[in-house]
Amino acid sequence: MHRSKRLFAVALIAASCVTQVRAADWGLKPGKVELKSAGALAFGPDGILFVGDSTAGAIYAIDTGNTKGAASAAPLNVAGLSAKLAQLLGVAEADVKVNDLAVKPESGQVYLSIKAGNPPQAALVSISADGTLAKVSLDNVPHQRAELADAPDSAVGRRGDPRDDAVTDLAYREGKLLVAGLAKGESPSTVREFAFPFADAATATNIEIFHAAHGRVEDGAVVRAFVPLVIDGEPVLLAGFTCTPLVRFPIKALEPGSKVRGTTVAELGNRNRPIDMVVYEKDGARYVLMANSARGVMKISLDKVGENPGLTEPVKGGGTAGQPFETIAELPGVEHLALCDDAHAIILARSEGGSLDLRTIDLP
């Protein structure tokens, strides 16, 4: 064998061994992952990707391998992404739906959760730093699975199937995976906590909010997007709901079997659904950047958000109140966003012609 080929083979074997050891450290074992659906995504330690599978009522932790590179490398831009996804997956472009995206901190690779085809199938797709797309093989990958013991039963109703919202968003924080979604019971809106590696069953907390646009307290409104952060020294969840209250929850209050009412720090307008949220700092101030279904991309100030006493009166007529924000007119059509580094984000945006494009942007 040529010396360069031998060295390459040795390098591949070494990389494989490192991956196997790293995966074993987190309790991951090789095997086939059979996704019934692929929804919310979040990265944890050592390039481990968490995938919410609402249909199966489960969370997967999947080793994605390569951890070399940097999220702050050259900007990643892929025009006509929807057409390229369709070609990669062998389906019509109209039958491709991106459910979420996440940026791998160690390498800068972008991962997408996909619903593709008719009937639809779940898939994961990675995009490398040079823009190359690849379907993530799940045939024999180190992974671990955690069950949602209290996932809602499937039942199609006026507001859709609650099972589809068993997992709506994920975030990894200090050895725990936080999972928002719906559960069985009379107070279905829930935040679950899984210790990772997965061992024990999740702890679950029912949550309720004052929904200013509706003028009432609700415990059935599901969290659509959230971010964990520290405000005035206290770890909190900042969560966005449909129609569009922004609510603060102290993480220390999320106790098993309890019911916690959050503080509604903003009402951002009705007939809208938050899609993704990221927290960043610019010019010494902190902000949330939030993509929405109908109200564009919002830059929300976190100034004095810890002191905000919360809204207690109705906000009618599609109005707004609470934390100040601005809508970023330069970012139309954004369907998903994720933080890339301290100064940049990755967005998926729909062009006027209907194409879905991936772009790297400066944080506004």
Kindly give the residue locations of the regions a language model identified.
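Bacterial N-terminal signal peptides that target proteins for export
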Residues: M1-F8
